A protein has these predicted regions:
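Conserved polar/disulfide-associated segments of primarily extracytoplasmic proteins
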Residues: 3, 18-128
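Preference for bulky hydrophobic residues occupying beta-strand positions
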Residues: 7, 101-103, 133
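Surface-exposed amphipathic alpha-helical segments
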Residues: 11-13, 129-158
Length: 158
């Protein structure tokens, strides 16, 4: 991996190292997950979090089609996801897409906000990047402003 992710975390959030996660949590995604951060919850509860993923595109894949189709990937990957909205996100990332949705995990309603974009480099070609913020739905209003500001500050550096 030649890139690293930088983001100005909101108060109460911190980066999470892979070795802090439960064993097997990233099984099958170890090569794509580039950054994880979470808010430290006040009580034992689902912690609001950010996961940044990088997925290389094949030489025959159309970057524009992959970007638009990546919204379908989250729906297919998580049982019961309902997409609420998807729109261009030029104000956050050139050529980016912003989407949101909801699902239930272990009896907790969750809401996600995902920023997706394509980044091309000479050495590695085109890659799909996604930054997915997730929190309990009942807390989304309280966290949205922080999530939005973190997404604005997020950058991939070589």
């Amino acid at each position: 991996m030649s890139e690293s992710v930088r983001v100005q975390l909101a108060p109460g959030w911190r980066s999470v190292a892979v070795d802090e996660l439960p064993a097997g949590l990233l099984r099958g995604t170890e090569d794509t997950v580039r950054y994880i951060a979470a808010a430290v919850p006040q009580t034992r509860a689902y912690a609001p979090n950010l996961v940044v993923v990088r997925t290389p595109l094949g030489a025959d894949e159309d970057p524009g089609a992959v970007l638009v189709g990546s919204g379908r990937a989250i729906v297919d990957a998580i049982a019961g996801v309902r997409m609420i909205d998807e729109c261009p996100a030029e104000h956050l990332r050139e050529g980016g897409r912003l989407r949101s949705g909801v699902y239930i995990l272990d009896e907790t309603a969750l809401t996600f906000m995902q920023l997706a974009w394509i980044r091309e480099t000479l050495g590695e070609g085109a890659c799909l990047w996604t930054a997915t913020f997730t929190c309990a739905t009942r807390e989304f209003g309280a966290h949205f402003g922080h999530m939005y500001e973190m997404s604005r500050s997020l950058e991939v550096v070589a």
